[in-house]
Amino acid sequence: MGTINYAELQQDILNTLVKQVTPVNFKNLAYPEAKLLQKQLAGCAPDSDMAQSIQKKLLKMKVNEKHYVIFTIEEIARLAEKNDWGLCRNQNEIYLYNGMFWSRLDVDAFQKFLLKASERMGVPIVSSKYYQFGKKLFEQFMMQSYLQSPAASSSSPL
């Protein structure tokens, strides 16, 4: 029986997760009303006042870096949950649950994974390759994915 290479197993899980990432409509996530406006626009005469009014509203709906950061992390969490894999932070460490056990992830490998996933989601290439954007994704993950230690039971010894 061979030993399990946990680093390879973790990388395989992260690679599988990245492959499942599909483009995300960040505008519709950031502005839920955009979808309704797009439907209304499709039903308007192209040069009508109503169409122009809707187009102006849609043009004002700009997706910014905060939207990309927040929704990228939410989408990664959704995909991990869909596969029964956990991704979380506990005591400033990142952990990956593969369905059987938790193991600690390398920070640099995880940041690289976040950037790859963001690129596949449709984050502009300049952002998805920029190290500062990777840091922001990582920081958002660290804030959003905190796993609190279970409360001590009064019946269990400390």
Question: Where are the model-predicted features located?
Answer:
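Intein modules and their embedded homing endonuclease domains
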Residues: G2-L158
